[in-house]
A protein has these predicted regions:
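Nucleotide-activated chemistry modules centered on ATP-dependent adenylation/adenylyltransferase
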Residues: 1-234
Length: 234
């Protein structure tokens, strides 16, 4: 917002959060609400109408089993998202957010600012600072994605948050996570999975996800069973 103010931006600004339901850290929405209040902007919360992230995994498995039973396919596929098929991001975040933005802003240009950084992955390291976003292009307006902190380090982010008198998500400050996404992420490190399991709020979804591992016989991550992360909780 400081940069936009300095550039003389006078258009509407909103924060938008796609809530993934049971798999979210419980503090994620309050963190967004606190940020919106500090910036003085409206927080728009969107959700997938057909159910949350866990519902998506469950329905994917149930549909696959039904096809297999009806001889419509020759092998079962895993219920989970994977690094190469991240429908968790595509369907429950990007698509839902883009749809909400098109409805809210039927005309004029839309700039979607995201907080990704090059340090986070090799894929993000290759992303441009600015690009056309086809998901938010409308007949009467262009769509763009802007990654304003692409070159920031983790320390830069922490220092900026503190300089504004705000505080970090409890996943960092209380449980020692190195990154925050879903409580249990298909791309999360073993350290972060264990950190998440240490939060009492995440125990119920942990057990539900392990139950799907058992039912499907597919591990949550290719080389790691979620059930092995915190077996004492089962």
């Amino acid at each position: 917002c400081d940069h936009l103010d300095n550039r003389g931006h006078a258009g509407p600004r909103h924060l938008i959060h796609s809530d993934l339901g049971r798999v979210e850290w419980r503090q994620s929405l309050p963190v967004c609400e606190r940020l919106a209040a500090r910036l003085g902007v409206e927080l728009v919360v969107v959700r997938r109408q057909a159910g949350d992230m866990m519902d998506r995994w469950l329905s994917r498995w149930e549909g696959n089993v039904a096809r297999y039973a009806n001889l419509a396919c020759v092998k079962l596929i895993l219920p989970w998202s994977t690094p190469s098929t991240r429908f968790c991001t595509a369907e429950l975040k990007s698509a839902v957010i883009a749809s909400a933005m098109r409805r809210r802003f039927p005309t004029g240009d839309v700039v979607s600012a995201a907080g990704i950084r090059r340090e986070e992955s090799s894929v993000r390291a290759r992303m441009p600072v600015w690009r056309r976003d086809e998901r938010t292009v409308r007949k009467s307006g262009m769509g763009h994605t802007w990654n304003p902190i692409l070159g920031w380090s983790r320390a830069d982010v922490i220092n900026y948050v503190r300089s504004r008198g705000d505080r970090l998500h409890e996943a960092y400050t209380t449980y020692g996570s190195t990154r925050v996404s879903c409580a249990f992420c298909i791309m999360g490190s073993e350290h972060d999975l264990r950190a998440s399991a240490g939060c009492a709020d995440n125990v119920a979804i942990y057990r539900e996800m392990v139950e799907l591992e058992v039912l499907s016989t597919f591990s949550f991550q290719g080389s790691r069973w979620l059930g092995d992360v915190a077996p004492h909780l089962l």
